Amino acid sequence: MGGKDGTNSREMMMCSRSAAVVGRRQVVLRTTTIQRTTTKRRAATLTTKNNGNKDDEVYRVMSKNQELSVISVTATKMIAEAQGRHKAAPTATAAIGRNLIASLLLGSFKGDEETVQVTFRGDGPLGQLTAVSDNLGNAKCLVGNALADPPLRPDGKLNVGMAVGKGILSVSRSHPSWVQPYNGQVSIYTGEIAEDIAVYMRDSEQTNSAISVGVQLDRELTVVGAGGYMVQVLPFASDETLDYLEKHIPTLDSPSTMVESGMTAEEIAKAILGDLGAFEEVETRLTPKYGPCCREELEGRMLKAVASLGREEAMKIIEEDGKIEVTCEFCKEDLVFNEEEIEKALQGI
């Protein structure tokens, strides 16, 4: 369900917003690469600009009547880091940011070591878009084409829906102790991310939710605001609470506008609850971070990728280049392996 945008086209070049509500009464939706090159790619160093919200945060609280659960996210720094690592174009940055925030909304505060993977496989120029997060607020993403940047929508907004295209949204929840992951999928509804996640939550996890995610870029293409929220309607919620929620949410600014203005995750959550109030005795917080892709994990995963080439192909690359350089598609970090390291990896298969 959309709200006020609050974006002045003369002051803000790009505003990316995705929002949806699925209510109990069926409220209508509204709005690892192996390289053969000696050139190292480095993540761009980007600065973030917002007026007071210095730190990214994931915040969860219930309404005072305990009929709603709210998770809110401020993630300007995280999305700026993702933009830099992937060297993403504006629309790709918006799509990456929205999906990272959505994965945080779905994955934070779950059981220990539980992870969630959110994947859009659309036919748009963006290609596959995947975000992975865990219960501690760590999240990372990969994208097929980080340079995807289709023309703006008629309203001047970034056209994330066109970039994603039509296809399948799949969500996989996993835990080391589970025999197999829980997998669910739905058709991509709009490609605008939040609408699709709301439909997934309703159809696959039977949870009614109000979801909004957004990313704002300025004229220099710097991320100036990124955030989102998810309001989950608990099974015993009264009609009065639902009526209030449906009337109140459209009056709110987009989450990216709220973050850009300096609001914290807690302030956003309490603005969403409004007159319902917050049951602060059960609030919880996390600090989201991009990653992790620790070197030890990368080395093991990348050596397996190299070994999968087979001895003949791997040795051919070593003979021609003297090394094999591998890039992690999540963090875009490069690792270089020499002949001795490759030989050990090949012996292990």
Question: What are these regions, as identified by a protein language model?
Answer:
Residues K247-I349:
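Cys/His-clustered metal-coordination modules, chiefly Zn-binding fingers
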Residues M1-T31:
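N-terminal chloroplast transit peptides
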Residues M14-C15, L29-K54:
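N-terminal mitochondrial targeting presequences
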Residues G3-T7, R24, K166-I168, K323, ...:
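Intrinsically disordered, low-complexity regions
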Residues K49-L286:
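Interaction interfaces in information-processing and related assembly proteins
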Residues S18-A19, R42-A43, M162:
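Residue-level detector of intrinsically disordered, flexible termini
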